[in-house]
Amino acid sequence: EPAIYFKEQFLDGXGFTDXRIKEK
């Protein structure tokens, strides 16, 4: 879900890739 994906990205503060890797 984009919402969670965006939330993770903001929490990490690293970027889209970081969030994506974390999610996957």
Swiss-Prot record:
Residue ranges crossing the lipid bilayer per the database entry: none
Expressing tissues: Pancreas.
Compartments in which it is found: Endoplasmic reticulum lumen; Cytoplasm, Cytosol; Cytolytic granule; Secreted, Extracellular space, Extracellular matrix
Coiled-coil residue windows: none
Keyword vocabulary terms for this entry: Calcium, Chaperone, Cytoplasm, Cytoplasmic vesicle, Endoplasmic reticulum, Extracellular matrix, Lectin, Lysosome, Metal-binding, Sarcoplasmic reticulum, Secreted, Zinc
Subunit structure: Monomer. Component of an EIF2 complex at least composed of CELF1/CUGBP1, CALR, CALR3, EIF2S1, EIF2S2, HSP90B1 and HSPA5. Interacts with PDIA3/ERp57 and SPACA9. Interacts with TRIM21. Interacts with NR3C1. Interacts with PPIB. Interacts (via P-domain) with PDIA5. Interacts with CLCC1.
Protein name per UniProt: Calreticulin
Biological source species: Canis lupus familiaris
